[in-house]
């Protein structure tokens, strides 16, 4: 009888040990993912994007020794109301640390998917450059609303703040060492600072609080080949989609 009890106690102890180790590994990977993103997100807000001319980033053997690198920043909002096309608006900017110049494009898109048909992509690009932290069209823009949107555009990196990133709890963690790829997803509230900032700047047609997804590929410690992006998903289903995505990373310059 005593032997059976001892075996039972031993079995339960081993079970708790396995559970603890598994949970510990999960928490460890979550902390790694957060730290990986914190390297970039701790710079937010970058109110003046010209500060990036003097900002170092992760470098590996993909960089030429004389190349300071180019920061690539991209922010976009996508909204699909029921029965309508997915409407996307955003801007991509390449900030060259070698030439201390920045150029890119503002873009709009409407993606329509009819029954039994392939999605129709209607992307339009409007070339821009940045001077004195302001965005200027480099080609004539006939649409007055697009002109204003370009002039008033702000990247997420300019107004967001992730000082509480390490305090986010109960994340849904995914890690695939084969790719490698990794992600951490958190349910936010409408009281979250960054959620308030997005609602202040965009007409978001839902009161649902979003989920925040931190997603990346490549080495967790850093990679110029992989990517990192963050996504706020307010709605995601067959008929409606509302999400905001943002990314900022240093890449080898194209002319080096």
UniProtKB/Swiss-Prot annotation:
Domain of life, source organism: Bacteria
GO terms under cellular component: plasma membrane
Pfam families recorded: DUF576 (PF04507)
Signal peptide: 1-24
Lipidation (S-diacylglycerol cysteine): 25
Keywords: Cell membrane, Lipoprotein, Membrane, Palmitate, Signal
Lipid-conjugated positions (N-palmitoyl cysteine): 25
Keyword Cell membrane: yes
NCBIfam families: SA_tandem_lipo (TIGR01742)
Family to which this protein belongs: Belongs to the staphylococcal tandem lipoprotein family.
Protein name: Uncharacterized lipoprotein SAS0073
Organism from which the protein derives: Staphylococcus aureus (strain MSSA476)
């Amino acid at each position: 009888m005593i032997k059976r009890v001892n075996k039972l106690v031993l079995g339960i102890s081993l079970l708790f040990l396995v559970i603890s180790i598994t949970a510990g590994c999960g928490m460890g990977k979550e902390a790694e993912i957060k730290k990986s993103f914190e390297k970039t997100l701790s710079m937010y807000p970058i109110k003046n994007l010209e500060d990036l001319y003097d900002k170092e980033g992760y470098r590996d053997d993909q960089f030429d020794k004389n190349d300071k690198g180019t920061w690539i920043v991209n922010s976009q909002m996508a909204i699909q109301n029921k029965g309508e096309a997915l409407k996307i608006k955003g801007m991509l900017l390449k900030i060259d640390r070698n030439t201390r110049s920045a150029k890119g494009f503002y873009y709009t898109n409407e993606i329509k998917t009819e029954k039994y048909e392939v999605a129709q992509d209607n992307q339009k690009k409007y070339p821009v450059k940045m001077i004195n932290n302001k965005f200027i069209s480099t080609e004539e823009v006939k649409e007055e609303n697009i002109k204003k949107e370009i002039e008033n555009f702000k990247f997420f990196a300019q107004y967001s703040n992730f000082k509480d990133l390490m305090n986010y709890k109960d994340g849904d963690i995914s890690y695939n060492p084969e790719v490698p790829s990794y992600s951490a997803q958190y349910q936010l509230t409408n009281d979250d600072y960054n959620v308030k900032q997005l609602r202040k700047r965009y007409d978001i047609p839902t009161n649902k609080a979003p989920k925040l997804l931190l997603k990346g590929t490549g080495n967790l410690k850093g990679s110029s080949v992989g990517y990192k992006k963050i996504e706020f998903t307010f709605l995601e289903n067959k008929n409606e989609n509302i999400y905001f995505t943002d990314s900022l990373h240093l890449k080898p310059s194209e002319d080096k």
